[in-house]
A protein has these predicted regions:
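A short, amphipathic alpha-helix used for macromolecular contacts
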Residues: 114-121
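A general structural motif
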Residues: 2, 27, 75-76
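N-proximal low-complexity "stem/linker" segments adjacent to membrane-targeting elements
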Residues: 1-24
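An acidic/histidine-cluster motif and surrounding catalytic segment
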Residues: 14-15, 25-26, 32, 40
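Active-site-proximal specificity loops/subdomain of glycosyltransferases
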Residues: 33-81, 86-112
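Short, hydrophobic beta-strand segments that form beta-sheet elements in well-ordered domains
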Residues: 5-9, 28-37
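Short, conserved clusters of charged catalytic residues that mark active-site
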Residues: 17, 64, 115
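A generic secondary-structure signal
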Residues: 20-24, 68-72, 119
Length: 121
């Protein structure tokens, strides 16, 4: 089971697609990873982790942010998700030859998203 979901985000305080697509049970596991100077702009009901000012604006900011997240998470199972993910489900015919929907993909239901995060090991 994924214990924590980290969402690194910059300059998108009013447009958190991934967070808004998650079921409430998973939103409670979210940690938004932000720059300290933007903290006052965010009001989502989740935890916040501010990246060190020393890495803000560097050409390796994303890589250093991922390392910072890794160190913060420690030994738990966690996910790092982009902040603008539409969460979709793919038709199973692509790997089982048995179709489970009319189209090739569709937006995942809240139950499917929750199941995905509960089963990923």
């Amino acid at each position: 089971m994924i214990e924590r979901i980290y969402i690194p985000t910059v300059r998108r305080c009013d447009k958190q697609i991934t967070f808004e697509n998650l079921p409430k049970e998973l939103q409670e596991r979210v940690v938004m990873v932000i720059e300290a100077r933007e903290r006052h702009l965010y009001s989502y009901p989740c935890e916040y982790l501010e990246i060190p000012e020393s890495i803000v604006g560097t050409w390796t900011q994303l890589a250093q942010t991922r390392l910072f997240i890794h160190k913060h998470a420690g030994a738990i199972k966690y996910c790092v998700a982009d902040d603008d993910l539409p969460i979709k489900r793919r038709n199973s015919k692509y790997w089982t030859e048995t179709s489970n929907m009319e189209t090739s993909k569709r937006y995942a239901t809240q139950e499917e998203i929750l199941l995905m995060y509960e089963t990923v090991d």
